Structures are given as C-alpha cells and as structure tokens.
C-alpha cells in the first residue's frame, strides 16, 4: 500500500445543452457569421468534454494529455467569447462535507474561467494519483513519481497565479466558487505535492546508499518543512481551509511532518556519532524519539497502515540507538548532553523545482503551434476583444451624436422659451393675417399629427408607467430574497444556538446590500416624482395639443378671426419677421447637422481596420486582444465627426446674437403697435397653438428619456437581484461549512482552538453594479429647455453580459418553507418605502411567549422596529381580531349574513 495520498477529482455534471447553447450564442452575438459554419467545431468541443471531463476519470498520461488539449481549447475560446456566456458549469467538491445539509450539491457558475480552473484541478489530481500508484522500490518508479508530482505542483502554481485571480474578479465573494477554489486550499495542495516530491528525492538518496547521513538528514528536514508549510496554508488567516480536509488528511500531514523531522534528527545523530559528538548524538536522539512518539499518537486518526508502519520502524531504530548511546556515554564517554534548544538547527536542502508544463503555461501558443495534435476551434470567429473594442468605439460615436442632439435640443428650447416670453410669433401673425392660420402653424400641426399626436404621448407615458412598476417589482423581489435569508438565519440559530458565536447576523452580513437597496429606492422615488411632474404637464396641455393635432378646421374654430382693418403694418414688423425666419432656418440647420451626424454614424464601420490591427498586434490572434491597442484608430475614426461638431459649436454664438437681436426688434415693434382687443385675443390663441407644439415636443422628449432611464435602471436592479441571490446561496453553503467544522471539533478528542468565522460579509464593492443611471435623466425641463439631458449610456459591455441572466450558484437546496412559515402563507407585496430595512433580520433572539394574534396597529408598530414583512394571512387575522375588539356586540347574539347585529 502506498504511503502517498491521491488527490480526489472534481466530478463534472453533464451539459446536454452545451452544443445548442454555443450555436445560439454565436447566432446572437457574432455579426456576419452563421452558426452552422461552426457546428463541427462545436461538436468537437462538446465531444471532448463528454469523453474526458464528464466521464469517470482514470489516472493515465493520455487522459492528462486530453485534459491539456481541452484546457488549451478553452483558453483559446476565451479570446473569442466572454467568460460568462450564460451557460452554467457545475462541479462537485472534492471532499464533500460529512455533516453538510446536502453534501452532494454541486457548485454551478456561468463562467468559462471556472471551467478552466476545474479542469486544471482535475489535472493536478490525476498527476498526484499517478504518483501515488507508482511503485517506488526502484529508481525508475521514483523518477516517474517525481515527474508527476513536480508537474502537479506546476499546474497548481499556474492555477493559483494565473487563473484564480481572474475567477475571483468574476465572483461576488471569494468562496462563491467553492472552498477548493481558494488560495488557502490550493496552496495546501501545492505544498503537499511538493513535500511528496521532496520525499522522492530523500527516498532515492536512501536507496542509493552513497550519500552521507548529514545530507540525507537535510533532505529529510526539507520534507518536514514542506508538510509544515502545507499545514500553515491550511490554517491561514484569510479563509482557512483546515475544516474542509478530512481528518485523515490532516493527520497524515501531521504524522509525515513529525516523521521526517524525527528522521532528520536521527540522521544527524548518526553523523554526530561518526564525529565522536556523543552528547549531541544523545540530544538529537531524544528529540527524534519525542517527535516519533507524537507522530504515533497522531497516527491513530485514520492514517494509512503503510505510513504508521514506516514511523514504527523509525521509532524502533531511534529507541535502539538511544539506549546504546546512553549506555556507552554513561560507561565510556561521559559527555554532557545539550538540551534541545542548544542543538544546531538543521537547515533543509530542497531539491524540488516547480515544473509548469508548457502545455499549461502557454496553452494558446501550444495549440497554435500544432503540438496539440489538433487545430484550434472557432478560429474563424472574431476575437471577443475585437467585439469589445468595436462596442467601445460605437459607444463613443453614439455619445458624440447624442451630445450634438442634446446641444440642438438645448438651443431649440432656449429659442422656444425666449419667443414665449416675447409673445412671438403670435403678435406678428395676428396683425399679418387677420383671418386664417399662418403657414408655419399649419406646418407644426402637420408634424404633430404625422408623429402620432396625443396617442403617441399616451402610449409613451403608459410605457413609462409600466417600466416604473416593473422596476419596483424587481427591487421588491430582491428584498424578498434578503427577507428569506434573514428568516432562514433566525430559524437556523433557533435550531443550533452554538452557531450564533461564529455566524454573522443577517442585519450585519447584508448591510452593504441594504444600503444599496436604500439608494435604489431613493432613485425610484425621485424618478416617480419626475414622472408625476411630466404627467401633470401633459394634463395641462393635452387639450391644446389635441386641437393642434386635429388639423386646420379645429384650429380655426379655436383661433378667432378679425375683419377689422389693420391698416398698414408698423415699419418694425419687416425686420422682426426676417429675424424670426432666420431663427427657423437656424433650427432647421441644426436638425440637419444632427441628421448628418447620424448618417455618418450609420455608415461608420471600422471593423476591417480593427481586425487588421488586431491581427498585426496579436501576431495572428495567438493571444488576448487588448482594447487599448486601438486608441489611435478610434481617434482617427472620430475625426469624421469633427466638421459637424464645429458647425454646431458655431451655432451657439450665432444663436445668442440672433435672440438678442429679436428682443431689440420686438421692443421697437411693441412701441409702434396699436392695441386691439380682438387682435389681442387672436394673438394669444395663436401663441397658445405655437406653445402647444413646443410642449408636445418637450413631453415626448421627457417620456423617451424616462423609458431610457428605466431600461438602464432595470439592468442594475437585475444585477442587484442576482447579487442578493448569490448572497443567499453563499450564506446557505456557509451553514454547511460551519456545521461541518463544529461537528469535527466535537469529534476531535484533543481540545482545539475555536476557529474564527470564515464567512465575511461581502464588501459594498462586491455587489456594486458597473453603472448608475440617475432619475435626473427623466426630469421635466423648464420652459427654457424642453428636453432633459440625454441619458448616459451604460458602460460598454459584451452583448452576452448585457442580455444574459446573472451568475447563479446552486450550493445547498432551498430549506423547507415549513421551517419558518406555514405552507399556505403567501407574502404580501412590498411595504411602503420607509421600512426598507426590513431585511436586517432580528438582532437578538426573542423571548418565548404564548402565541398571540397581534392587532393591525401592533403589527405596524412591530414592522417599524423589526424589518420583517407581514404575510397576507397574518394581516387578515389581525384585521379580524381588531374588528372584533372594536365591536362591543361581537360576543353577543348571532349575526346576519349581511353583517348587521341582531
């Protein structure tokens, strides 16, 4: 039986939809590409996973090479796809928790990086298993085992330094991928396989029989140091992993550590004997005997018989040598025996070098070089970095066009508010056309009618209202998840009070999420206020907009005519009318500039240039494509918009001059105009129609900006809800881990130090969305600006991340709801905004009291102090009881069915 321990593998769950999902993703996210063109590549990748990853793993070099090919394909695939393609990869833990509520639940993450990490872990396990299976009684077996172990250490080194940081950046908490994907756990395994590799060097030196005792002792001490480093990593301060290893593993490492330190002292005692240092010989033998005894005591906890047998043989040799040395020294040499702290320390000599296989360290280069025996799959797809670069450029040009349009809207709004304050052009039109309607007004009426009129605004406002309610519902669903976690935690503490010392209360653990929820609720409230302002504005102007959109006949009925002779027009009318016509031309010119910018944007495609630059810089696509490579290309591409931007900037100065000129000319016109009541009324109503046009545009812009805001905000709430779900799953799996740790402590005979809680509440940054739309994007504009500032677009991201659901974890199954609520109970809709802190849980255990159905008032008071949502059933029962208390006849005679008292 081998005295090496094999590392168990992580069993993968099948992915029957792997092929379909890849094809659908290619169809949805890769332009100018037909998914069927890559069906063969998809089938090959799916077949590799099914044949090697999902099958029962056997420790064989060909299996490891197959894993290397699959890992290389995944690494190459990561240059084409984002890590999250909305396809969950599920793996079981290598050491299922013995006392977990559900030890067989796999960990599922939508991450290609997680898939790579699990493949590398299994590669390490296969290397260690092959080393444990080698017969090390001969030099060739030792050499093969040494090669396997150094390769295993190299794969773990690559996993810890290259893959794990990327995986950690994708997760909301460090343990979301499982305890086996933490630096503590992987570092323990790395030091463990290095210890076994060093043990191979020590064994080879012993077998050859040509090395001196001093050198063999130093080799042995280095083995002990590696085992000691493994134990230290296991008990690290950041997320220690000691409770996740089986007891026999911990005992095995303790026994090995003391065994080889004792062996080192024994070898150095032989050297002392050769050099006639008899006192030092006895001192080292005593230290060795003490270590061997401790090792034998620790070996009672499930350590393999072969390991115990080796230690017993060493202990027998030490004991025999110590008896001889003491007898000889007492009778012959009579040298003083130094205490253990005065013996010269043994400095270990390490012979092991971490060997990261080239197939693992440079997987893409190995694949592209043809050494893998297969071509890289999906080589015809454009790299994901190129898609990301194109999305960044598209966002920049869209932002530029939006800025131009925003400046146009700002100038047009300033013109509208200025004309409104001057009562123009109604005052001139009333004099110029005593009957009928001005052509400019008829043109505006036609524009409103052709754009949908009042029905368009109604549909837009209805959509705003629908999206607002959907956002409120999303936030409430997220809070329901936190409520559920708080209830489960209280039920858990009630069942297992011993966990209260090591488990954070819900109101502490979820504090970052609660703070974020408060910010989201405040944003929703602010946006709701803006919605109400826009609706009030629409109610005020709906009648006049309806008249404007109804056409010429309706407007003629509204605008009175006059048959009184107006006489000759004042001389100041002509220059004022010319200025107003110039203002209309300026407005039309700015609209043309925006249309021109949009046409340039529609035809602007720098895809060929980006592909060419990516191929040149990445040397044919053999590595990741970085978006910063294309900054010069972006600047060159945006130069085509500079002409339109310069013209729009010039419009600002000309616009201010023209408005000032109109004000001056209007003052001259007012001083020359003759007042007529009929003309005044016609002037007012013409002005109403003109202002109704501008209000129609303003409300349309407000509603469209509101829709953009709520759509952007919905993405944030979707991510927040996913973060709450991940928080719930993390807390659930933490229950199993803490229960396991507690049970292990109870089963260990020696008293051990009480471990600190492993779980730490996620930081606010862990759940922070990448963008924060503000409700100010849906603010009603003042008369000086009929349109609010344009919505800032979310940060550019891959389409997969924008459209796919968030990452989800499937750690422990949902506990039975009967543990905290009857099966018939259904939860009320969210309470009003003030009790947003309802998910904090109960900070202290309530005292046991006889069950009493509280009144509505009591429940309301309670919800203010205890952030717990009330169920419909509880509310109905309380309502009935309160009504009974109010009715003094309730305990008297019978009731009629209609509710009256007889």
Curated annotation (Swiss-Prot):
Pfam families: ALIX_LYPXL_bnd, BRO1
Residue ranges, compositional bias (Polar residues): 744-755, 854-865
BRO1 domain ranges (all copies): 3-415
Protein name, UniProt field: pH-response regulator protein palA/RIM20
GO biological processes: regulation of protein import into nucleus
GO cellular component: endosome
Similarity remark: Belongs to the palA/RIM20 family.
Coiled coil: none
Disordered: annotated span: 744-902
Biological role stated in the UniProt entry: Required for the proteolytic cleavage of the transcription factor RIM101 in response to alkaline ambient pH. May act as a scaffold protein that recruits the calpain-like protease RIM13 via VPS32 to its substrate RIM101.
Bias (Basic and acidic residues) ranges: 878-888
Bias (Low complexity): 757-799, 866-877
Domain of life of the organism encoding this protein: Eukaryota
Assembly behavior: Interacts with RIM101 by binding to its YPX[LI] motif.
InterPro entries found in the cross-reference section: ALIX_V_dom, BRO1_dom, BRO1_sf
Originating organism: Cryptococcus neoformans var. neoformans serotype D (strain JEC21 / ATCC MYA-565)
């Amino acid at each position: 039986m081998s005295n090496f321990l094999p590392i168990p593998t992580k069993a993968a769950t099948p992915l029957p939809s792997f092929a379909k999902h890849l094809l659908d993703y290619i169809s949805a996210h890769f332009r100018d590409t037909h998914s069927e063109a890559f069906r063969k590549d998809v089938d090959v990748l799916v077949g590799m996973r099914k044949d090697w990853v999902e099958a029962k793993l056997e420790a064989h070099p060909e299996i490891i090479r197959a894993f290397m090919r699959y890992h290389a394909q995944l690494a190459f695939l990561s240059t084409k796809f984002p890590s999250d393609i909305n396809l969950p990869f599920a793996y079981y833990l290598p050491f299922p928790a013995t006392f977990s509520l559900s030890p067989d639940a796999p960990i599922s993450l939508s991450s290609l990086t997680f898939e790579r990490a699990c493949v590398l872990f299994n590669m390490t396990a296969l290397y260690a298993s092959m080393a444990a299976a080698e017969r090390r009684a001969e030099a060739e077996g030792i050499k093969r085992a040494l090669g396997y172990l150094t390769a295993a250490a190299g794969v773990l080194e690559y996993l810890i330094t290259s893959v794990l940081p990327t995986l950690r950046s994708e997760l909301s908490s460090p343990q979301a991928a499982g305890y086996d994907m933490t630096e503590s756990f992987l570092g323990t395994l790395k030091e463990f396989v290095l210890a076994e590799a060093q043990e191979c060097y020590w064994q080879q030196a012993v077998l050859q029989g040509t090395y001196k005792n001093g050198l063999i002792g130093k080799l042995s001490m280095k083995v002990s140091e590696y085992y000691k480093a493994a134990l230290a990593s296991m008990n690290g301060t950041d997320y220690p992993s000691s409770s996740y290893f089986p007891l026999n593993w911990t005992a095995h490492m303790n026994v090995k550590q003391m065994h080889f330190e004792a062996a080192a002292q024994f070898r150095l005692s032989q050297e002392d004997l050769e050099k006639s240092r008899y006192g030092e010989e006895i001192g080292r033998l005593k230290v060795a005997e003490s270590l061997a005894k401790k090792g034998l005591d620790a070996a009672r906890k499930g350590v393999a018989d072969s390991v115990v047998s080796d230690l017993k043989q060493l202990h027998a040799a030490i004991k025999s040598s110590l008896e001889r040395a003491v007898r000889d020294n007492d009778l012959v040499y009579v040298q003083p025996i130094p205490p253990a702290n005065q013996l010269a320390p043994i400095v270990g000599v390490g012979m092991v070098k971490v060997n990261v296989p080239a197939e693992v360290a440079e997987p893409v280069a190995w694949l592209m070089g043809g050494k893998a025996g297969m071509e890289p799959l999906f080589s015809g797809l454009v790299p994901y970095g190129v898609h990301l670069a194109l999305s960044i450029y598209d966002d920049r040009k869209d932002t530029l066009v939006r800025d131009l349009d925003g400046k146009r809207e700002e100038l047009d709004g300033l013109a509208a508010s200025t004309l409104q304050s001057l009562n123009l052009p109604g005052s001139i039109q009333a004099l110029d056309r005593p009957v009928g309607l001005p052509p400019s007004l008829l043109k505006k009426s036609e524009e409103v009618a052709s754009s949908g009129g009042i029905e368009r605004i109604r549909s837009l406002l209805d959509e705003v209202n629908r999206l607002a309610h959907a956002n409120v519902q999303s936030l409430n669903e997220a809070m329901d998840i936190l409520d559920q976690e708080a209830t489960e935690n209280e039920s858990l503490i009630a069942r297992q009070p011993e966990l209260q010392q090591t488990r954070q209360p819900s109101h502490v653990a979820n504090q970052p999420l609660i703070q974020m929820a408060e910010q989201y609720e405040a944003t929703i409230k602010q946006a709701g206020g803006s919605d109400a302002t826009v609706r009030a504005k629409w109610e005020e102007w709906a009648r006049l907009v309806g008249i404007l959109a109804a056409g010429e006949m309706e407007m003629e009925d509204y605008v009175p005519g006059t048959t009184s002779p107006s006489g000759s027009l004042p001389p100041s009318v002509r220059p004022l009318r010319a200025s107003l016509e110039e203002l209309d031309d300026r407005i039309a010119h700015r609209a043309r500039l925006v249309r021109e910018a949009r046409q340039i944007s529609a035809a602007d495609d720098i895809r060929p240039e980006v592909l060419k630059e990516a191929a040149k810089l990445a040397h044919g696509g053999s590595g990741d494509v970085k978006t910063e490579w294309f900054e010069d290309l972006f600047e060159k591409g945006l130069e085509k918009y500079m002409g339109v931007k310069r013209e729009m900037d010039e419009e600002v100065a000309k616009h201010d001059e023209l408005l000032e000129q109109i004000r001056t000319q209007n003052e001259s016109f007012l001083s020359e105009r003759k007042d007529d009541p009929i003309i005044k009324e016609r002037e007012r109503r013409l002005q109403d129609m003109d202002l109704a046009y501008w209000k129609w545009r303003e409300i349309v812009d407000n509603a469209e900006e509101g829709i953009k805001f709520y759509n952007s905000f919905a993405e944030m709430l979707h991510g927040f809800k996913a973060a709450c779900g991940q928080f719930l799953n993390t807390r659930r799996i933490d229950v199993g881990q803490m229960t396991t740790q507690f049970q292990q402590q109870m089963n260990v005979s020696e008293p051990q130090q009480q471990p600190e809680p492993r779980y730490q509440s996620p930081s606010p940054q862990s759940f922070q969305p990448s963008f924060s739309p503000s409700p100010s994007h849906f603010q009603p504009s003042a008369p000086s600006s009929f349109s609010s500032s344009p919505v800032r677009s979310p940060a550019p991201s891959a389409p997969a991340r924008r459209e796919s659901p968030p990452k989800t974890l499937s750690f422990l199954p949902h506990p039975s709801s009967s543990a905290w609520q009857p099966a018939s109970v259904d939860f009320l809709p969210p309470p009003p905004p003030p009790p947003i802190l309802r998910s904090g849980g109960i900070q202290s255990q309530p005292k046991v009291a006889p069950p009493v159905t509280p009144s509505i008032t009591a429940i309301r008071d309670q919800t203010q102090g205890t952030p717990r949502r009330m169920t419909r059933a509880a509310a109905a029962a309380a309502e009935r009881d309160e009504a009974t208390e109010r009715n003094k006849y309730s305990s008297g005679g019978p009731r009629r069915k209609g509710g009256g008292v007889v």
